[in-house]
Curated annotation (Swiss-Prot):
One of its GO terms (cellular component) is cytosol. Signal peptide: none annotated. PROSITE patterns: S1_IF1_TYPE. One of the essential components for the initiation of protein synthesis. Stabilizes the binding of IF-2 and IF-3 on the 30S subunit to which N-formylmethionyl-tRNA(fMet) subsequently binds. Helps modulate mRNA selection, yielding the 30S pre-initiation complex (PIC). Upon addition of the 50S ribosomal subunit IF-1, IF-2 and IF-3 are released leaving the mature 70S translation initiation complex. Belongs to the IF-1 family. Keywords: Cytoplasm, Initiation factor, Protein biosynthesis, RNA-binding, rRNA-binding. It comes from the Bacteria. GO terms for molecular function: ribosome binding; rRNA binding; translation initiation factor activity. Its main location: cytoplasm. InterPro entries: NA-bd_OB-fold, RNA-binding_domain_S1_IF1, S1_domain, TIF_IF1. This is Translation initiation factor IF-1. It is found in: Cytoplasm.
Length: 72
């Protein structure tokens, strides 16, 4: 999948789930499941409930996403 095929949203982490999964409430009031990106795992960036994050989603499945950035 090319970089142009992703859709970016902002949201808030509402719940931590097993296997490094998170429930994220987007700014448009949709809730999705998301996991952290590989660079965030490699650099051990912790994501906690209540954190503001950027989420990348594919247009083919709008219920799952990848957390790419955590705001301070």
């Amino acid at each position: 999948m090319a970089k142009e095929d992703v859709i970016e949203f902002s949201g808030t982490v509402t719940e931590l789930l097993p296997n490094a999964m998170f429930r994220v409430k987007l700014d448009n009031d949709h809730e999705i499941l998301a996991h952290t990106s590989g660079k965030m795992r490699k650099n051990r960036i912790r994501v906690l409930a209540g954190d503001r994050v950027n989420v990348e989603m594919t247009p083919y499945d709008l219920t799952k996403g990848r957390i790419t950035f955590r705001y301070k």
